């Protein structure tokens, strides 16, 4: 009783040294438990992250194996070749390497069909056909497809009239394609059924305003090619010129009317070739040197795509940009490398 009274002052009990040490040990135990819990959680997190890393590495290895797995082209029936950059440096510089000629000939010997595709509209179709046949690349005009030629066929197929009236904003190449074709009439006065846009370095507002009036009165809008802008020369001026797509975008915005694109990578030009050859996309191959047009367009239709490090030429044209990551089914350094897969 005396010791209890001595340890009480003002109704409070003093804590003995032994009591303090007990509380301290309890606190230490609690802290240790928390540390152990944190370490355990961290360990679980680390083990999960390690497992995740291992899984990712395994998937990457599997993907690499799949990519490295060689594809077979033996069942393919139609081989479509880009012209500028794969067959010739440029249609304006028509020289074809010997190994390119030999490769195409070997593909023919294996019983395959071949086609040659270009977004060209600055040069008329008949001239492109002449060049490719004179070089020994193409056997006939039926194997050759240009944006200009397909644009003419598209207008004829979509018109509700026997002979559609067409207003063309372009340089001579595309204009000639429409002028010499039976079944269409090139006009410079109303009424107009189709407004077709190509590339024109001396474009003026009078043409644009007339095109807009025609669209507002019911004409359809068609873009021939697939170019934002390009480098070129006109008279004494050398530099950048506006392409067909921005002109169509402007007229489409002003008139509120959509437009059809004729040219890689859009499906109309690929679909036209497949229809002409009566080939299913699964049995066709596209060989090109540009991801944004050749490869992207082929993959959209289920056509096997091959990227070739061809003849570096495209000095005059800037490809249309795309934010999507596009990978070809096969990459080769030289066109002759394709023979190993057929």
Identify the role of each PLM range.
Residues 1-58, 63:
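Arg/Lys-rich, intrinsically disordered low-complexity tails that mediate electrostatic binding
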Residues 63-94, 100-101, 105-110, 121-126, ...:
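Asp-based, Mg2+/Mn2+-dependent phosphohydrolase catalytic module
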């Amino acid at each position: 009783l005396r010791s209890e009274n001595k340890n009480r002052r003002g109704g409070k009990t003093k804590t003995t040294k032994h009591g303090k040490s007990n509380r301290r040990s309890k606190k230490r135990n609690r802290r240790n438990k928390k540390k152990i819990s944190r370490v355990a959680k961290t360990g679980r997190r680390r083990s999960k992250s390690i497992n995740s890393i291992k899984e990712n590495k395994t998937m990457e290895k599997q993907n690499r194996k799949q990519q490295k797995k060689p594809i077979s082209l033996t069942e393919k029936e139609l081989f479509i070749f880009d012209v500028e950059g794969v067959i010739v440096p440029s249609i304006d510089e028509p020289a074809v390497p010997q190994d390119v000629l030999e490769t195409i000939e070997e593909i023919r010997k294996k019983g395959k069909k071949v086609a040659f595709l270009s977004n060209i509209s600055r040069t008329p179709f008949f001239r492109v056909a002449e060049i490719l046949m004179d070089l020994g690349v193409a056997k006939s005009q039926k194997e050759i497809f240009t944006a200009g030629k397909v644009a003419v066929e598209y207008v004829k197929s979509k018109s509700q009239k026997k002979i559609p009236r067409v207003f063309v904003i372009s340089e001579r190449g595309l204009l000639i394609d429409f002028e010499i074709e039976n079944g269409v009439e090139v006009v410079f006065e109303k009424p107009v059924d189709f407004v077709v846009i190509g590339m024109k370095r001396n474009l003026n507002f009078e043409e644009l305003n007339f095109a807009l009036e025609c669209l507002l009165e019911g004409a359809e809008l068609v873009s021939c090619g697939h170019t934002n802008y390009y480098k070129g020369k006109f008279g004494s001026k050398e530099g950048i010129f506006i392409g067909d797509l921005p002109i169509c975008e402007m007229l489409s915005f002003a008139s509120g009317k959509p437009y059809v694109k004729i040219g890689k990578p859009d499906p109309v030009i690929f679909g036209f070739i497949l229809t002409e050859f009566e080939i299913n996309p699964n049995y066709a191959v596209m060989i090109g040197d540009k991801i944004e047009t050749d490869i992207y367009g082929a993959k959209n239709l289920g056509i096997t795509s091959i990227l070739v490090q061809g003849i570096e030429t495209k000095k005059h044209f800037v490809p249309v940009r795309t934010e999507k990551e596009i990978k070809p089914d096969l990459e080769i350094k030289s066109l002759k490398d394709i023979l190993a897969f057929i």
